[in-house]
């Protein structure tokens, strides 16, 4: 009986060891972004997005646009994304969304203050785009549908909706 007992425990120990090895290998199976070169970057970016549930693809795509928009340089973006999984990137996206200043149109003071916060939070490369956009905006007037339609938007969302905004501004159409 001692022999069977010893053999039984060896099998259990072997199964436990195999389970531990498999569990340790699982994180390695998670798709991660590799930014070491452009080909690997785009290949792994697609793999990471495909590894997410289909319901998260749109959020991931929009979030990546946000990351690129607010990044100071490609090197900074690559450093931030390298080695991250889809879930980790979605977490970064949520943190960014929560931290980005949004336009407040509730009063003239709130509007002007939120514009200053937006500008201060932009990478230097986007400040001229911001200043150009400001030139297209009419003066603040409570109830102005153009301004009201932008309430709660980040600057990136405003830029994405720029064609819509310009279609409501005759001065911008004449440029």
Question: Where does each model-flagged region fall?
Answer:
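Sec-dependent bacterial lipoprotein signal peptides
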Residues: 1-27
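Short hydrophobic "helix-edge" motifs at membrane interfaces and signal-peptide entry regions
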Residues: 17, 43-44, 113-114
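Bacterial signal peptide processing site
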Residues: 30-31
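Post-signal peptide N-terminal segment of mature Sec-exported envelope proteins
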Residues: 35-59
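Compact alpha-helical subdomains of small soluble proteins
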Residues: 63-175
